[in-house]
Each structure stands twice: as structure tokens, then as C-alpha cells.
Amino acid sequence: MSREILHPPGWARARGYANGVAAEGRQVYVAGQIGWDAEQRFVSDDFAAQVRQALANIVAVLACAGAKPEHIVRMTWYVTSRDEYNASLAEIGAAYRELIGRNYPAMSVVVVAGLLEPRAKVEIEATAVI
């Protein structure tokens, strides 16, 4: 895969994400992943624990296509609470670095009123290019 981080001249440095990514190769689309395990049981009601599980689920789906976390070029996070997200940033960052590494794709975080699964606090979609 060839990949280029897009950063307009004069813009402040993006922290923890890229403003854009240009990539060539096989595309892999990962549906929204939530904080439940392979048996569709929630691992925790803790926000950071649900993020960690959702990220682990993304890594597992990517592996089915022969992709790795470094192939991720875009992520969209849907969170049910801005406050819980912000309060958990240190733990989220640690889980992200452990599971995804220091790959910072184009990324959006959207606060939503709720998710389909009532216990879900976060849902993360990913696109990868191999």
C-alpha cells in the first residue's frame, strides 16, 4: 500500500489524527464495532474498556483480510457522551497505542444521542487500504 498523509501548508499540526490520507491498494471496510466480545457480550460498562474492546474487534476483522492496524486510513467514532470520552482520554490513548500503534488516520469523533445496543457507549468504523 502506498499512503500519503495530507496536511495543508500553514495549518497547525494535527494531534492524534490526520487531516487527510491518500492511499492506493485493496480497500477493507470494517463495520461499526462496539465494546462486546466474540460472543456479543459487553466486556464492561466502563467507557474506556468499551473503546479498548471495539479497537480489538477492529484488529480482528482487519486480520480476516490480511490487514493490520497500520493499514487503517480512516476511522469514525460515535460516542454517546462527550464528557465520558474526554474523562477517559488517557486510557483511550493507551489502549489505542497498544492495539493500533502510532498510526493516526483521518478521524472523526461524533457525539450521538444513542446507539442501537443500549449498553454501547462507543461505536467505531474503520477503513483500511492494503
Q: What does each model-found stretch correspond to?
A:
Residues 2-130:
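Short, polar/acidic, helix-capping and beta-turn segments at strand->helix junctions
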